[in-house]
């Protein structure tokens, strides 16, 4: 029997390499006792027999050049001629061990069954594994502590910390950037994918949010935006950046509290006292997702830097935003179609539908790629039906209240921003969303909708709806008929503009009729509309009178196929009327092809009382 000096390393703990002297005839259980005795503080709450021990073998290369763990096979004659070697202390894997990190090879070494305590070291080392004799400048034994087994020195005297065993958070130190991606070995909790796409906006926002020109003072930042746009994933990106920079970070996550002390990832079981200024200091970044930092028990937010990610809601952001120093607010942008195309291969189940969902629901990955069980038009219709008109034009902001309809209406209303992401606009998810809002509200809230035509100043959402409201309103006026102010349109070359006149449009003999297309022989004095929204020629027609275009802008062109349709409308039918609001009636000019006789008809805004609630216009 020979006394050997074994260099041991605790997997996942920085600076944990230490030596143990023991007789090689002793049992493995005695080695465990010796390891615990050598590091009593590290193994304070774990019994020696619970430790898992693995041999630190030097890797060999397989046929592809990849490093793999050598396996001793006594039946192979060539293996009896040469002993397996120990892991050199300058090998890449050994250096990572000393830093408290791990890699694929360390994972491979510790993936097998640990040796039984009843075996002798001689049997374990030489008989079963044919190892060479231990010497200096080597790592010999890897020590793995089972879950809940670590008792690490607390970072503060009163906080309770333990080594992190969550595989996702444990890997952050070893995750590298590959192109525009972070590649993980475990699934991200939110996306259930192993890759995180680094949007250019992530980098810009993080650069500004984490920059603190006032050394020694706390820094506050708020990142907000449309639900489902990726704010929580952005928090993981910020966590990765701070860890790579070896900064102290405390993450408030749904999976628990995670603390990185600059070298090791820990789980926080109890926060240190708010009086512990060594722990709570401006260099500590607290990352908070969807919680009001001022209401988190035990968090002295005035002593540390805080980044809060939240949807635009007063209960999460309002009180925190009041605290000095004033938080920098950033607005996470919607995803472009190109960005979504980059991550779409990770969601093969959405391959056939994501582009249509993007057109309908806007640049929100959760709705476009992840939660795709509901038809997008049905999703928008449900939101329109569940919300009042006031709900549908309320301006979202960080001061917005939260009620039962908040989440629903955010399917319709999004927040758009551009670099440097400090300002935002409230917009609708899509043209389809606006069409459906007007269509569903026209029957019961017609007066309110019509009131927007002349009094929507100050509310960009209401202004966005005006074009679609005008189409519905103009169609009703057409169906009713009557006398309208009008003028013939001429090219810009004509110096004199003809005077206004009046024209009588006959009342439709029946309510507007839906037709597949314009056809010869359709009834005179009957208003027809196309049955599909993608009918591109004209918006409506009346045989022996003419075709109609609902127009809310000066640049409206004549659609392809209009001339052919007008030719089928019979006597006096080959003419095109542009129905225009007061804003554009005077300045509207003749469009190409100019061979078509064209007229502008003034459709005045209705004179109705504005019934919108004041809150929607604030």
From Swiss-Prot:
Residues 58-139 are annotated as: DWL domain. A motif (HVLVXXP motif) lies at residues 140-146. Residues 1-19 form the signal peptide. Residues 18-57 are annotated as: LQLFLAK domain. Pfam families: Crinkler (PF20147). GO terms for cellular component: extracellular region; host cell nucleus. It is found in: Secreted; Host nucleus. Keywords: Glycoprotein, Host nucleus, Secreted, Signal, Virulence. Glycans are attached at residue 534. SUPFAM superfamilies: P-loop containing nucleoside triphosphate hydrolases. Belongs to the Crinkler effector family. PANTHER family: HOT SPOT (RHS) PROTEIN, PUTATIVE-RELATED, PROTEIN KINASE DOMAIN-CONTAINING PROTEIN-RELATED. Secreted effector that elicits necrosis in host plants, a characteristic of plant innate immunity. The CRN proteins have modular architectures that include a signal peptide, a conserved N-terminus, and highly diverse C-terminal domains. The conserved CRN N-terminus harbors a distinct LXLFLAK motif, which is followed by the conserved DWL domain. A highly conserved HVLVXXP motif marks the end of the CRN N-terminal domains and forms a junction where diverse C-terminal domains are fused. The conserved CRN N-terminus mediates the translocation into the plant host cells. This is Crinkler effector protein 16. It comes from Phytophthora infestans. The gene is CRN16.
